[in-house]
Structures are given as C-alpha cells and as structure tokens.
C-alpha cells in the first residue's frame, strides 16, 4: 500500500475547511480513512495546525475534535532530537519544509502531497500536488 506523507497545508485545508482547497483535502483524507492509502502526518503538522487555530481564533474545541478524528486513522510521525539536528545541518532554507521532508524519508513515505511543490525542490522523494496524487491513485 502506498504511504503518502501529507504536508501541513493539506491538513490545515481540511481542519479549517478552506473553501478553495477543501474538496481535495477531504478526498485525500477519505482515501486514507478507507484504507486505500496509508497517510502519514507529522506531529509538527498537528502542532502547527493548533497554533494557527489559536492565532486566527478558530473554536479550539472543534480544532481538537477534528485532529483527534484524523489521528485515529493516520500514522503520526514523531520528531526526534536527531531529526532536529539533521534538519539543522541539511542546508535547506526553510526549516519547517526541511523537517517535513526529513520526516517523510524517516517514515519511508512513497511521496509527499502538498499544494506547494516549490517548497520541496531538493526533495529526495516524489512530491505531488493533490491533483497529481489523485492521478497516481487512479482516483477522482
């Protein structure tokens, strides 16, 4: 089964129901829920989503509720001290993107799914937009 590492922007689209991007995010997570693909989401993505919820004054009980539901069927990737050190020495300009990339590799993901492919130009694994992901899955 394919292991797809989900970037923070896709998780945020789902949790905050971002109108323009919500259908793709819903479809990605529905595929994971149906066990058609194994989704991997970083602990950092959960933290970033909670931070954004507070920053933009979303009802936090709803944010936590949605994240708990998601955590029930995705693999949550841990961040280790070694991950932090490796990313600091990686040479990437964006620490958060480098952390996601390194975590995806550690989790043996087949791809990273993101709306911002340009953030992963130096990726050692395949990076897909949601549309490309659906094409690869033969879905939508």
Where are these regions (language model features)?
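Acidic, PIN/NYN-like endoribonuclease modules and their adjacent C-terminal/linker elements
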Residues: 3, 73, 102-140
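Residues in flexible loops and secondary-structure boundaries
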Residues: 19-23, 78, 84-87, 95, ...
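Alpha-helix capping/helix-boundary segments
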Residues: 10, 45, 83, 100, ...
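PIN-domain endoribonuclease scaffold, especially VapC-family toxins
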Residues: 3-4, 26-94, 98, 102
């Amino acid at each position: 089964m394919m292991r797809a590492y989900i970037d923070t922007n896709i998780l945020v689209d789902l949790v905050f129901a971002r109108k323009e991007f919500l259908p793709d995010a819903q479809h990605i997570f529905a595929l994971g829920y149906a066990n058609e693909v194994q989704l991997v989401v970083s602990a950092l993505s959960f933290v970033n989503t909670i931070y954004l919820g507070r920053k933009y004054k979303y009802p936090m009980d709803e944010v936590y509720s949605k994240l708990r539901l998601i955590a029930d069927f995705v693999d949550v990737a841990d961040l280790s001290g070694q991950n932090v050190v490796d990313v600091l020495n990686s040479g990437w300009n964006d620490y958060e993107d480098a952390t996601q990339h390194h975590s995806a590799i550690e989790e043996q993901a087949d791809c990273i799914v993101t709306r911002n492919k340009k953030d992963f130009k130096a990726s050692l694994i395949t990076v897909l937009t949601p549309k490309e992901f659906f094409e690869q899955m033969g879905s939508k």
